Amino acid sequence: MAYRESFYRYLMTQRDADSSDEIAQFANNAQHDLTFPKQEQDYEKLSDYLELNASYLPSMYIFDRAYRMYEDKMMY
């Protein structure tokens, strides 16, 4: 079985403090979320966590887009 990095680790590659991009802002804010499930890969578990705890995420659509990008990267 091939190694698959966590969603958090992927998300951290999207950080950019100078960007107004929604995914970059999500990544910037997630970096400061001390309880973010950093080892998680599962969409449902991440989605549940964010819906309940991530007041910094204005729309779950942003997470959905970021997760699709993560899945695309993990295919290669």
Swiss-Prot record:
UniProt similarity note: Belongs to the UPF0346 family.
What is the species listed in this Swiss-Prot or TrEMBL entry?
Lactobacillus helveticus (strain DPC 4571)
Top-down, what is the taxonomic lineage of the species of origin?
Bacteria, Bacillati, Bacillota, Bacilli, Lactobacillales
Entry's InterPro entries? UPF0346 (IPR010673), YozE_SAM-like (IPR023089), YozE_SAM-like_sf (IPR036806)
Query: What's the name of the protein?
Result: UPF0346 protein lhv_1069
Gene3D superfamilies reported in the protein's UniProt record = YozE SAM-like
Which Pfam families does this one have? YozE_SAM_like (PF06855)
Which NCBIfam families has this protein been placed in?
PRK13672.1 (NF010193)
